[in-house]
Amino acid sequence: FPNDGNAPVKFSVNNKVKFDCTVKSGTVGEGKRYTIIKSGWDNGDHKSLGFRISVNRTNEAISNAVLSDSMESPGVTYKAGSFKIYKGTWDYSNGTWQLKNKTDVTSQYTVNATDTTFTINLGNISANDHFAVEYEAVVNYDAVDREVIKNKATIVGDNKKPYDSNSKVNIQIAGGEGVGYAFGIQVHKVDESNEPLKGAKFQVIRQATGQVLGEFE
């Protein structure tokens, strides 16, 4: 079906046309609007990830707006120098959102970033101030097939309570076996005399990232 216009509809039974007509088609409703919404993707090498934060599709006026972001998956860090801030007008048409009349305004703002967090003070946002913040991140280890990279963005202002948007990038490796995070382990705890040891605690740590997967007794 085209997004808008007339579309042919034909029903056949046993290779015989029973119903043949034209119907009018179009996009139903409007795209959902969020104060911010996060999207992320794997650039193909499973090392470089791309992210975008779409800001103010809701046409809000926010005083002293601050946008923050945190990388929640260990071993993944922002790529220095990759941050871009664009300003324009968010428009929903033909089933997709586009930032029309996009202008690069990166030089007008300061990105305060560490390896895994950043903040941008957007100042006083009017209802007509629409933004897209784009950046890249680096996976500093060999990711496994079906691994999920998690990331969260938040916007807050004097008249705006913290509003979050979460993003998940699914790593899909061609020929992967779908191992993901599935694992099993059995531990028999004994003392120096090979007797069962009570009250001992241990952690399961992922060697690639140092992430603690669990603590057990």
Language-model regions, residue ranges each:
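Short, ordered, surface-exposed loop/turn motifs in non-cytosolic proteins
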Residues: 62-64, 193-216
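Short, surface-exposed beta-strand/loop "edge" segments at domain boundaries and coil↔beta transitions
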Residues: 16-21, 91-98, 126-133, 163, ...
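Hydrophobic beta-strand positions
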Residues: 89, 155, 189, 204-205
